[in-house]
Amino acid sequence: MILLLKNILEFLYKAASAALFGILLLLAFMLTANMGSEAFYGLFRYDYLLLYALIIQFCLLYLKLESWAEAKVIALFHVMAMLMEIFLTHPAIASWQYPQPAVFKILTVPLFAGFMYSAVGSFFARSLRLYQVVFTHLPGFLPMLVLALLSYINFMSKFFIPDIRYLLFFWSIALFWKTRVYFQLSYSRFELPMLPVLLILAFIIWIAENISTFYKIWLYPSQVDAWHMVGWGKLGSWYLLLLLSLVLVLKILGNRDGQGRWQLKKTADK
């Protein structure tokens, strides 16, 4: 019983540490809600959130809570996410909108928005290190990369050609069906199938999305007049987007051998 309690506490502590970037962002969303659309010293809420996110990123690196290698892959995901944001918030598409003004923005997207995706990348990168994660039966990186890129492209191409998300779901199931995730705590080692882990993470992000829209960080068209919970269908979107972040992290921060075993590079923490 004592060992179980120790494992639970250690797991939760490491999970909170890995998700630190995202947790701090959510707290800021709540605490700045009353700022609304008013300007304070020439800047708006989104601008202060950008400065806040930059400070968090600096502190994570300065305090060595995040490595430069991790920061590089997170930055790549950040850029790809911003490109998708610019497309999907264009008035002709309007999948969602940022309802408040900003000084620092690119077209319809405030610059802080990319850091919400950075928080996801940060969680993946830090989790792999904190839990000493090892994957077995991991597919080759080429099929994983093709799946991730097609998922990314489908977010935008579905407005012009048929939506292939269900094909991508089935492909991901076939691809990762045998993949296992091993993670280490001080007193125990655990093994889980990869697919349920991805679904759980997608659900957690869906909860964070509901918090974010409630505090008007962004809004879907149906939420503009009155807030309501984000539809369950968004779980699938987050699941597919997680694949892109995961593949980038796995490719840059680790090595996969010929038997499908993946582990962090020894230099990944430098």
Question: What residue ranges belong to the model's regions?
Answer:
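Aromatic-rich, lipid-facing transmembrane alpha helices and their immediate juxtamembrane interface loops
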Residues: 1-270
